[in-house]
Amino acid sequence: MTGTQDTVLVVVRGPSGAGKSSVAARLRAAYGRGVAVVAQDVLRRTVLRERDLPGGANIGLIDLVARHALDHGFHTVVEGILAAERYGPMLARLAADHRGRSHLYYLDADFDETVRRHATRPQAAEFSPEDMADWYQPHDLLPGGLERVVPQHSTLDETVERILADTRLTPPFRHR
């Protein structure tokens, strides 16, 4: 078991360019201190400099960091492409083991939309639409109906508002 009955786990998955990192950042900004963001790209690409392969070390590291944050009372947002085939079993175990509320989301976006969004990002030069095509998996949902699907027409504000409402993740009272 991991976390407490008071911690909230949010998983935000979807294709490259779907807005996962933006959603995670906005959730943290809305709540303030007390939200840990566990970003697949940071752990896999920056910390480990590992390719996304089946059985990669980053899968266990993502799980470990998320559990550590939950066990220390942080609400936790895990975000990344997190392909169902590779990361699904870990995410299902994490959600099942979590003592608090767990909410999993898939930001659905077709390939053309992900390419359009990618062109507007600061890291647009890091990889090409051809690279994106190699790893794009349409509607890559976790088995068992664990996720709520957020359609591509949902704006960033709408998506964040929906997740905040679903999770009841509201900031603690702050003294002025």
Each model region followed by its residue ranges:
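Hydrophobic anchor at the beta1->P-loop junction of P-loop NTPases
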Residues: V12
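P-loop (Walker A) phosphate-binding loop of NTP-binding proteins
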Residues: P15
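ATP-binding Walker
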Residues: A18
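Walker A/P-loop
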Residues: S21
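Conserved substrate/cofactor phosphate-moiety recognition/catalytic segment
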Residues: A25-D71
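Glycine-rich phosphate-binding loop used to anchor ATP phosphates in small-molecule kinases
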Residues: P54-S102
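Conserved phosphate-donor/acceptor-positioning beta-strand/loop module used by diverse small-molecule
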Residues: H98-R117, V150
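Small-molecule kinase domains that catalyze NTP-dependent phosphoryl transfer to phosphate-bearing small molecules
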Residues: T120-R176
